Amino acid sequence: MENSNLTTSIIETINSIFETLFSSIDTTIYSVLDELTFIDKNILNNSIFQKIFGSTGNNGLLVIANSLLVGFSLYYAIRLIYSYYMNLQIERPYQFIFKLLIFGIVMNCSYFICNQFIQINSFISDAIRTVGSNIFGHDISFSELINKLNYLSIKEKEFNIFSFDGLIKSFISISLFNLIFSYSLRYIMVKVFILITPFAILSLINESTSWFFKTWLKTVLSLLFQQSLVAIILLIIFSFNFSSNNIISQLMCIGGIYALVR
């Protein structure tokens, strides 16, 4: 009898600990996860970030980029003189000057270009979420997803981590917690690649460095378009029947959460 009471007490303690932990995770996640995932122009509306980037060509990283622009010009001038001496074929002066002017202007407008590109990307993901909102009658967001998943699992007072519903609740909470780290890293990486935008554009002036722009562009596109993919996955998840008695719905929701983590 004492062993039975001890076992029950241990189980209740474990359930209480995990219930408190998962409840804390849930109340923390929904307030930040949407902001981290669905990036908009607010990511650039930071005075410190603007100073680091450089609102004009006279401050921030744009100063370094413009200095490198002068460096590319000197490098080409030396190559041109050397080519005349060694009778080598290099890029014609008017071609280089044309590229220098075009990419120099684009480079100094890179902050504006990034701002507009982020707004377009945000518009696409918001459009997908708006379609879902019109269909299902509620927001397509992580905060709404957490509310639905809490309904899908079980009531807090009945939480039992050793039950099927308890395992589902545990998996969902831990997965969403992992999403915070993944999308926080993505948020930081987007900022990093925005900061190096002037240097990526500058690399197009010389054919030997143009690979840097291609790598930068592929990475930026994959980072930004990820939020449209997340919006589509959320749309699919919300199409499921959220019922605690429907095991298939529970498994499909777990599959959707797993897809978000991956």
Model-flagged regions — what are they?
Residues 3-21, 92-108, 213-220:
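Alpha-helical transmembrane segments and their helix-start/interface "positive-inside/aromatic belt" motifs
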Residues 68-104, 196-210:
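Hydrophobic transmembrane alpha-helix segments characteristic of membrane transport
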Residues 216-224, 255, 259:
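Transmembrane helix-bundle signature of multi-pass membrane transporters/permeases
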Residues 201-218, 239-243:
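Alpha-helical transmembrane segments
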Residues 63-71, 159-166, 191, 223:
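Structural signature of hydrophobic alpha-helical transmembrane segments
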Residues 1-68:
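Binding/recognition "hotspot" determinant
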Residues 10, 14, 21-25, 104-196, ...:
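Non-cytosolic segments of integral membrane proteins
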Residues 52-73, 94-108, 112, 124:
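Hydrophobic alpha-helical transmembrane segments
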